[in-house]
Amino acid sequence: MMNDKRIGLALSGGGYRAAAYHIGTLRALNKLGVLKDVDVISSVSGGSILAAYYALHKENYNEFEKGFIDRLQKGVLNSSIIYGIAVLAIILSLATLISFILYQIGICSGICVGVGFMVFIGLIVFVVSKSFTILPISKLVSEQYDKVFFSQAALSDFPEEPMLSINATNIATQQIFSFSKNSIGEYAYMLLNGKSLFDATHFPIADAVMASSCVPYGFTPVTIGEKFRKGKLSYCRYGSFI
């Protein structure tokens, strides 16, 4: 019987385009009377933007859809500005470095040119090694997610039903890393008492969605601060992976 079955909805990724496409999915399910019976939503990347916003505003579908479409337009614009500034900064930096090298070639000996080249390589290595902190693109986008979509909501603000799992990838273990109302993490971060090392109560939804939509090299990884930890690494089964 239908009542004995659970309904799961998977929303895939693809940035803001995927989020826009999934509006059609939810609209169709709502018209069929199925959306209200969905028990579990699993999402990634652009699908997580829509899934998280829907979970917070599911009580009135029409208001949810209108509100999301309005905010989606703002989100696309804001992200375009952020990316534009980042690209411009990179172009200007490279132009400066190239100009420096060409200048050195024009007036210096081979040794001087070699020094200039080594400085150039050193700067590249420095930027790559410190990209977590000096290129906080993910932090900027997360702030925009929060401003446009989530208004400082935390994972604990999600409803009990449908159960929402926002999925990301843990670069330390190469495993699926999930965010939900009552849990953060994966098996490698389970304490000996069977609970997660991380506290989901006050963890920002915007950060969870950013982690889910964090395309490698396009964004910097999202880290989880000490204030969201409930235990010590020495009591974690797989603490060496953290």
Please state what every model-predicted region is.
Residues 1-2, 32-35, 150-158:
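Surface-exposed acidic, glycine-flexible loop patches that form ligand/cofactor-binding
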Residues 2-7, 231:
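A short, charged/proline- and glycine-enriched loop
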Residues 6-10, 15-118, 122-132, 136-139, ...:
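Patatin-like phospholipase
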Residues 17, 113-242:
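Active-site gating loop/helix substructures
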